[in-house]
Amino acid sequence: MDLNAILIILGVIALIILVAHGIWSNRCEKSQYFENSKNFTREARIREPQENQQYQTADQSQSDFQRNLLETDNDCFSSESAHNSHQPLYHYSEQSAVQSVDQIKIRLPDSEPNYVMQERFSPKHTDYASMSIEELEKSIDLDEGINSSSQHLRQELAQISGQSIADDKVNIEEHMFTESTISFVEPQTNTESQQVVEKTKSGNSSFIMLYVVASENQGFSGLQLTKTLDELGFIFGKKQIYHRHVDLSITSPVLFSVANIEQPGTFDLTNIADFYTVGIALFMQSPSYGNATANLRMMIRAAKTIAQDLDGVVVTEQQEIFDEQAERDYLARVS
């Protein structure tokens, strides 16, 4: 017998041995698995369904809570949606920065199309953005937020007021805010919105401002700022600034807005990676759509959250620290 035949025979024998060993190993593993399954204690079998039941209960509770929120939102805005369903939609991006650190001039033209914006929202933590005004007013904790009455923050404000804010104020007044306008037009069939616009036309409206400024020699990164605004339910819109709507619907009224305090007051999303600003301004019209007190509380909560996330300071219209007394004074203006 030649060498080739011997090698072929040895190869076949080796292959048969490998196949037999694989089959034997597979059977051993299956046998061990079934032996282990028989050793499970009765306690372990009982614990698993109990844990599953707890998870199911928690999931069911969360599902019920979300369902209640959706039903509340639908009840609140179903009538408005029905009225507006026959009207054409005008796509818009709202805002041409309305703010300065001390003086901000805002005019309200008689007519302009309703703003419609593309929704950009990434919820995180508690979903305040999707809650209705009534739910938010009940659930909001007025004591939460930044401890803005601390001595450390007061020292930061004193430094900021003497440098960054003063410089930005001059630039804003000279180049931008004397020319900026923002309009809010009521839905034609919405009685409450009509009353707001009628007061605006009669000259009885005003704007309530809050500022969030960065620490000395620092600034807010565009990526971090836009991420925080998106998480709070703001939508980038007309005039290249952000707006907070009633229910994140592109047809719902605007409650308050956010703009850059640096000229020209806008947010350049095309170069957001290189965008920096020393601060932002939050402003709302008074009277506003719905409950003005609830809207103002929501704006204050948003300002505190932004300051906390970006290591900034909340400042009043008079460039003073926004403490508990200042918050009471602000709420008194709409009560």
From Swiss-Prot:
PANTHER family registered for this protein in UniProt: CELL DIVISION PROTEIN ZIPA
Pfam annotation, one family: ZipA_C
Subunit and partners: Interacts with FtsZ via their C-terminal domains.
Any single Gene Ontology cellular-component annotation: cell division site
Name of the protein this chain belongs to: Cell division protein ZipA
Top-level division of the source organism's lineage: Bacteria
Entries under InterPro entries matching the protein: Cell_div_ZipA, ZipA_FtsZ-bd_C, ZipA_FtsZ-bd_C_sf
Annotated GO biological process: division septum assembly; FtsZ-dependent cytokinesis
Segments on the Cytoplasmic side according to the record's topology features: 26-335
Protein's UniProt keywords contain Cell division: yes
Cellular compartments annotated: Cell inner membrane
Gene name as annotated: zipA
Membrane-spanning parts: 5-25
